[in-house]
């Protein structure tokens, strides 16, 4: 899917003023802002159809399950400051367009436009990315709410956010399956920023939540050969900018001068995320709060402490599962296929 350029100044003004946004030939009305971070803003929008007979964005969407019945979607606006940021956005669009899986948030459409800055009449670029909307928020949002209420996910829900075992479910497989889809590419892709803030949840009455992994801005081919100190430092610098520190694998903090990096960096992040699903905090931020010291040292040494959880507590087998994923040596850390086999056994043992 190629990037679209045009001089739609009205787009920039509309977003800031709560008006209408055009992505290529489709028009959307800003309803409200959902969030922001860095140079990006996320808005809830509703498609505007001038003629009821027009199908609008629906005709561009390949998977009918991604078509909104009420015309609401999410738009991510990215302010692009320089050519480096422009290339990063283009790469995010390219990578996002590779994936097609029910547990990975799909990019429905996009536009990169040139806009005139009012103050000095100069031009800059902005990107607009269209996605399905999930209004129940992220796993991080839910964890914060549950922590205030001193609530916990059940063992069954914890496992089924990771891996849905009911083959009759439209959302079968969940987080692990989304990661498996990425790792199954040739060459494999790593997400590189798996964390609760990048997992969207949709709650369902009487069922486990639907979990969808989003934000592929850091996703890259997973396998890298490091053969010098310079290459190791370059990887560490890249990781410091693209991989959230509390969920970053040890080999991305302190990379050897001779190393083979692979998709198991994501397994580490998955282990941290599973811990966070259980306790509402990442393992090494919790350890840091308990003992102080350095986040990097806590991660490199895999210092895991267990918070007070629900009553009755989570089973020891679940703790062992987390510890298995948080092996500091990547060569002995499991692959996603191993994770799926193991979590299926846990689900059959502990799910209701």
Where are these regions (language model features)?
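Short beta-strand micro-motifs within the conserved protein kinase catalytic domain, predominantly
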Residues: 106-124
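Conserved short submotifs of the Hanks-type protein kinase catalytic core
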Residues: 122-138
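Activation segment/activation loop of eukaryotic-type protein kinase catalytic domains
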Residues: 197-246
